[in-house]
Every structure is written in C-alpha cells, then in structure tokens.
Swiss-Prot record:
InterPro entries: Membr_insert_YidC, Membr_insert_YidC_N, YidC/ALB3/OXA1/COX18, YidC/Oxa/ALB_C, YidC_ALB_C, YidC_periplasmic_sf. Residues 34-43, 57-76 have a biased composition (Low complexity). Interacts with the Sec translocase complex via SecD. Specifically interacts with transmembrane segments of nascent integral membrane proteins during membrane integration. This is Membrane protein insertase YidC. Residues 29-76 are annotated as: Disordered. One of its GO terms (molecular function) is membrane insertase activity. Pfam families: 60KD_IMP (PF02096), YidC_periplas (PF14849). It is found in: Cell inner membrane. It is a multi-pass membrane protein. Belongs to the OXA1/ALB3/YidC family. Type 1 subfamily. GO terms for cellular component: plasma membrane.
C-alpha cells in the first residue's frame, strides 16, 4: 500500500467521522417517559444514630417527583438568599440552588457580556440542584427541600476581600423535637459548595429519614451543527461507582437504555455540557441509591440516602459537595474524588480518555512555559512530531520503496492480465525478494490515529482554551477563524503535500478524489474551532517539511521494468 493511498484512506476516514458527528445527532428534544421510583439505600450505621430499616419497595411520591412538583411554583422572594464569591453568584433557598452564575466566565468576549449561567430558573429550560429529606414513613415529619429556613436576617451574603470562607446557616424544626441544621459553605476560588446536615432528636420517639440529592434539568435544544462547538461535546448525565466506573447517558436518549436503580458507595453523579458541569459528591463512606428518571418532561439524576434512625437524645450528620462550575482540570484534581476527572469527557472509552488526559497534561506543561494556549498547541504538535518521528520515518521509507517498484508492479499487472491469482503470487515474490513490507506505510498511521483523535477531543473539550487568544486576528481558540485565514493555509499545505508525493500507479478515480480532498477539508475546517485548525495547519506544515526531507533522502530513482519475464512458482 503506497503512502498516497494510505493518506487517502485516512483522510476519508476523518471526513466520515466528522460527517457522522454532524448528522448522527438528533435535533428533537427528549421525549418524556414515565417516572420510575425506587427505595433509598439501606440505612447507614453512623455514630450517634441507630441504623434504621429501609424496605426494598417502591416509594410512593419519591423525592425526585416531589421536588419537581414543588419547584413548579416559584419560590417566594422572601425565602431567597443570594451568595456571591469571587467566582460564583448563587440564588438559593434552604434546599435548592435555583440560579448559578460563573463570574469569571463571560458568555462572549464582548465588553459587558453577562457571565455564564449554569443553573437557571428559565421557565423553558429550568436547571437546578436540590437537596432535601424524606422518609419511608408517611407519618414522620420531614423538611423535604422547602422546609429549611434561613437563620438570621441577612439575605445577601458576600465573600469580603481577605475572607476565605463564608457560611450560610439554615434550620428545620419539627414539633416532635427533631431538628436539622444545614450549613452551606463557600470558599474563595472554589466551585464546590459544601452542604452539611446535622440531625438531632430531643423528642421522645425515634426519627427515621433519608437525605436525597438531585440534579433536575430540562435540556436546551442545541443547534446540531459543525458551526456550533457546544454540540460537539457530550450533553447528559453521568455517574461513577467503584465497580462499574464511569457511566453516562445522553439527554437525547435519556431512558433509552432503561432507568438506573443502583446502590453506590463513594460515587458521584453529574450533568455535563460543553466546558461546564454540575455534580453532587456525597461522602466517600456512605451509601446512596442512585436513580435516573424523567418527571414532567424534565431529566433527573438523584442519590437517595443514606437513611438514618435517630434515637431520642442522639444526633448524626451527613455531608456532600455540590460542584457548579467549569471543567478546569487542576481544580477538579484538588477535590480528590475518584473518577471525577472523567467529567472532562475526552471519550467514553477508558483508553482514549487516558490518552486525552496525558495529552492535556503535556499541553498544560507547555502552556506554563510559553504562557499562551495557541503557542502551547504549536509546541505540543512539535513534541508529538518528534516523539512519533520513528513511526513516520518507517512510513515514509516503506512508501518510498513501494513507489520505486511501481514500474515492476505495473509490468506484472500487464503480464498476467485478469489472472489475479498469478499476479498476487508474482507480486508476493517481488516483495519477498526486495524485502518490501506492503503494510509498512499503513501500520504507523494506525498506531498514530488514537493519538490524533484524542488530541481532537482535548482541543474541543478543554475549557482552558475557551476565549483564549493566540495572536493577531485569533482572539478565541474555541471560535472559528473570523477571516478564514487558517483554513486557507491548511488547504495550501494539503495541496503542496499532494504535489510533493508521487503517485505512480494510482487509478484515475483515486487521483480525482485526491484532488478534491484539500478543498473538502478546507470547507470543513472553515467552521471548526480555530485552535483545532491551528493544530491541523502546524501538523500539516511540519508533515510537509518532513515529507520533503524524507523524499529527498529516500526517494531514489524508480526501478525499471525487467526485460525478461519474472519467474512464477508453480503449485
């Protein structure tokens, strides 16, 4: 297989993948499905509380359904609390985070652009995080998500200059003597909001209840297009457990594979979109029952539990973190949560995700040296070219040798005509005699393909590149080139690469396909993020120089056809 043919196959494979990404996505909103409910996880044995018994049965009026129904009516303004830090502005009541703005991430680069709103009360596409308490016993008083009341009169909390932490206290008290104190803690330069619930029972009877934590969203209908980078990324719910690891479900087919009913210890749940995500992270040592469902056209993922039986005179507590923010790799790593790095969704496949994480690590190290994400991309491509040079050299040498012997192969084809068996036998004899490996040009490309595909997703998925400039006219590496300069350069690089690569023996159809390939790629790249096109231009430009050098070094003169018939072994 000569190098031009290998390039043709690889190029059309790339076209097929990109077209598949464009056309395989559904434009319709998710179809509501019946609500599925299930019991919370078995009660936990926690110091200060007696383990309770939770039946493995369907729970009427499960928390997810109740939470959605309750939120259908707007929360009174008197109950709302605003919390502002250096990175977040939250609107919440005791049990819900109703609105969340990411103050360091404007929606556009225009001056005065409002910040990204991750959680929202938009009636068309509401998105909230909910935490409340429920009970198997309908006679047991519980706060739900609405029962918590703010302690004190302050309703606007602001993290002051020099202050590193801010606490917002809530409380719920039952006539039976049960009290739940809820404390929300926000910190400087952190997107994780810490929830701590302390349950105490001063009554005369045991109290049974369990905590639930929910993400509830009506997904936005995305414009599925190569011109819309948001549609490239995974949009849906994900969860993690120590046995089955990372799992996910897209919004567009939320319940296509059934509901989720699973007890998980030390896991987490999340909803992802391009560059941003929300996640509930319960305590590592507590077990919860994870549920995936749809209620009233809204997609929910929920962790129910742990459940507690709190005896008179006893108390217990449970904690969780709510992440509301960007997919910043360094900050996610600081949370020290197993598997949380997978929310930066380079791939659903573990091997590709590991390759993507490694590539981003290298990209980040280069960025620390050069201080610019555009130049970091250039540096990463140079490093990859150096590392992969032995494979590329093998590919070029094999292709050059195949091209040199094309006159001999053409002679064999002419000699044996339609007798393909004799032609193949003679060609194998030629390969063996001249020590030609027909797969030598193909294997290196197959080895490199996972790296190139992983790098594509690194450049698309990394929020660090969002609105990051390169230089000159490129002021946002995640937006398309406004003047199409990089796509035009990419077309020129591909065209010169074709001209530099001899293609003896290629049939007319392949030649026509090759002639159109730079134009096809140019049109597609015109609407891709400029950071991705920058990668293709640098990679192609270095490849062109490498091709020129290798052709000069290993090209040689074509081996002329023989004057005597080549011997063919008889069977």
């Amino acid at each position: 297989m000569n190098q031009t043919r290998v390039f043709l196959i690889f190029a059309w494979l790339m076209v097929a993948v990109l077209l598949w990404m464009e056309w395989s996505r559904e434009k319709a909103a998710p179809t509501p499905a019946p609500t599925t409910t299930s019991a919370p996880a078995a009660a936990q044995s926690v110091p200060g509380a007696t383990p309770g018994s939770v039946p493995n049965a369907q729970v009427p009026g499960a928390p997810g359904q109740a939470a959605v129904q309750a939120q259908a009516s707007a929360t009174p303004a008197s109950q709302r609390v605003t919390v502002t830090t250096d990175v977040l502005r939250l609107v919440l009541d005791g049990g819900r985070v109703l609105d969340a703005e990411l103050l360091q991430f404007p929606q556009t680069k225009d001056e005065g652009s409002p910040p990204v709103r991750l959680l929202t009360e938009d009636p068309a596409h509401p998105y909230s995080a909910i935490s409340g308490w429920a009970s198997e016993d309908k006679n047991t008083p519980v706060p739900g998500a609405d029962g918590f009341k703010l302690v004190g009169d302050t309703k606007d909390f602001v993290l002051a200059k020099g202050q590193n932490e801010l606490q917002i206290p809530f409380v719920w008290t039952a006539d039976s003597g049960v009290t739940i104190k809820r404390t929300l803690t926000v910190s400087r330069n952190e997107y994780a909001v810490r929830f701590k619930d302390e349950v105490s029972n001063t009554g005369a009877a045991p109290w049974n209840g369990y905590v639930y934590r929910t993400l509830d969203r009506t997904p936005t209908i995305l414009s599925r297009s190569m011109t819309n980078p948001d549609s490239f990324s995974f949009n849906g719910a994900t969860w993690y457990d120590n046995d089955k690891k990372y799992q996910r479900r897209a919004f567009k087919d939320y319940l296509e594979d059934g509901t989720l009913n699973q007890n998980i210890t030390g896991g987490w749940l999340a909803m992802l979109q391009h560059h941003f995500f929300t996640a509930w992270i319960p305590q590592k040592d507590q077990t919860a029952h994870y549920v995936l469902s749809q209620v009233a056209g809204r997609d929910l993922i929920e962790a129910r539990g742990p459940a507690f039986t709190v005896a008179p005179g006893q108390s217990t507590s449970t904690e969780a973190r709510l992440w509301v923010g960007p997919k910043l790799v360094n900050l996610i790593a600081k949370e020290d949560v197993p598997g949380l790095d997978r929310v930066v969704d380079y791939s659903r496949f573990s091997m590709m995700a590991v390759i993507g994480q490694g590539l981003f690590w290298v990209l980040n190290q280069v960025h620390k040296l050069v201080g610019n994400w555009g130049w970091a991309i250039v540096g990463l491509v140079v490093l990859l070219k150096l590392v992969l040079y032995p494979l590329s050299a093998t590919q070029y040498k094999s292709g050059a040798k195949m091209r040199r012997f094309q006159p001999r192969i053409a002679q064999l084809k002419e000699r044996y005509g339609d007798d393909r068996q004799k032609f193949q036998t003679a060609m194998m004899e030629l390969y063996k005699k001249e020590k030609i490996n027909p797969m030598g040009g193909c294997l290196p490309i197959l080895i490199q393909m996972p790296i190139f595909f992983a790098l594509y997703w690194v450049l698309v998925e990394s929020v660090e590149l969002r609105q990051a400039p390169w230089f000159g006219w490129i002021q946002d590496l995640t937006a398309r080139d406004p003047y199409f300069i990089l796509p035009v350069i990419n077309v020129a690089v591909m065209w010169f690469t074709q001209k530099l690569t001899p293609a003896p023996g290629m049939d007319p159809m392949q030649q026509k396909m090759m002639q159109f390939m730079p134009l096809v790629f140019g049109v597609m790249m015109a609407f891709m993020p400029s950071g991705l096109v920058l990668y293709w231009v640098v990679n192609g430009g270095l490849g062109l120089l490498q091709q020129w050098w290798m052709t000069k070094r290993h090209g040689g003169e074509p081996v002329p056809a023989t004057t005597a018939p080549a011997p063919v072994k008889k069977k």
